[in-house]
A protein has these predicted regions:
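Beta-propeller domain segments
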Residues: 1-124, 133, 143-174
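Asp-box/BNR beta-propeller loop motif
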Residues: 52, 204-205
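Hydrophobic core residues within well-ordered beta-strands of beta-rich domains
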Residues: 72, 193-194
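Short, solvent-exposed loop/linker segments at the N-terminal edge
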Residues: 182-193
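Acidic, Ser/Thr
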Residues: 196-204
Length: 205
């Protein structure tokens, strides 16, 4: 809310005087001033508001879920079930009122919970197994599915892995991952074979 005078939780930038090439004191978030010679509006600005969620390149003590590395937050939608009453399929009530936000550089999508006044409560990884490739936009479609636009790995040129991803919600248990093995695929009678389902996974028991 205070950019370019402040960043994150109202950490101020010093004012730079280009005429004298000198740095001056940082702006006061309670009473920021626009001292630019190009300013055609107010000099005394409203109090700056700290960022709703902010995090550094390193580990965040306040938001450890976001990880580390380069950062580029991408805002997404707040989910409301009433918007999808006639949708073929819609996300469950669990996501009601939650904000989905991403980070282009880190490739995650977070599900962020807020209280009735819009204050931050908690966040959790949305689809932890899904690593988006430079997500630049997230929206719900009228069909109730979530669409994620991935920029891809290459900047300012063609990316073969750029794509539009559709994420649909399917109720009920997840499909098991089945692995079947046979000790032999054929032979003379009497044919004996040993069958195994080792490695089969049912995520929901």
């Amino acid at each position: 809310f205070g950019w370019p005078y402040f960043i994150g939780e109202n950490r101020g930038y010093p004012y730079y005087d280009y005429a004298t090439n000198t740095l001056h004191e940082e702006n006061n978030p309670a009473k920021p001033l626009n001292k630019s010679v190009n300013n055609t509006g107010l000099t005394e600005l409203p109090p700056a508001q700290p960022a709703f969620i902010s995090y550094p390149y390193g580990v965040s003590d306040k938001f450890p879920e976001v990880g580390t590395g380069s950062r580029c937050a991408v805002g997404g939608p707040v989910y409301h079930q009433d918007d999808f009453k006639n949708a073929k399929r819609a996300f469950p009530a669990y996501y009601e009122g939650k904000w989905l936000a991403a980070d282009l550089s880190r490739g995650w999508i977070m599900s962020i919970s807020m209280d009735k006044n819009g204050n931050y409560k908690s966040m959790e990884r949305f689809l932890p197994s899904y690593q988006a490739i430079e997500p630049i936009d997230i929206k719900f479609g009228p069909d109730g599915d979530l669409y994620v636009l991935e920029y891809g790995s290459n900047w300012f040129r063609k990316s073969d892995n750029a794509k539009l991803v559709r994420i649909e919600y399917n109720s009920g248990n997840r499909t098991p991952v089945v692995k079947a093995k046979a000790s032999a695929s054929g032979g003379a009678l009497p044919f004996k074979v040993q069958l195994s389902s080792a490695g089969t996974i049912d995520y929901d028991g």
